[in-house]
Amino acid sequence: INDMAKGRFRLGVGTGWLEIEHDLYGIPFPDLKTRFEMLEESLIYIREALSGNDKGFQGKYYQLEQFPVEPAALQDIPIIIGGGGKVKTPTLAGKYSDEFNIYAGPKEILSNSISLFKEVAVEDGRDVSKLEITTACPPVVGLTQDRVGESLTAAAKALSQSEDEIANTWKEKSYLYGTPDEVAATLSMWQEVGIEAVYLQLLSLQEDNRNETIEVIKQAVELI
């Protein structure tokens, strides 16, 4: 995939969180502590495999016999570690990731997690300037207040929550919400704490809604 994408492929690795999804596929879903242990062990192996180590791997959870990892990637494949954990997630990201995708949240939480991520990276001898910090959230936005209201109604329906619940949660967690002016304030805060890019988790794939969301973001960026 990385070769076909001309080096644009990025590998996102995580603990898993949606238990029902694991149940449906018959995949074990151990407790969070165990899942984090499994994640770290898998990251150690993945790093070695991607760097050309064909000696196999022997760990507590994973045992892989010696085999060549072929075809080899044309270049390094960036690893993304993301989530909203305040300690373990930024710690693992600082050790192993090329991109820390911290889930959107209040400024203080973002700032603390990003600081820990950088501290761990430096302690591990990594060049922080070469590591990326991104975020992700589902936008509830519109070019006008009326359009924001329509987006809010659609989000409430998609997520099976009330409009008040959506509005309160989005504002409380500093997700992208509102008109371009309001969105610009959130983007400015993200920029201030060190976030460089955002992945938009679109709740509607209808072309008009998608295009309006993109236009809101464009106008917001111009206001910063």
Q: What does each model-found stretch correspond to?
A:
Residues 2-224:
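Active-site-adjacent structural elements that line small-molecule/cofactor binding pockets in enzymes
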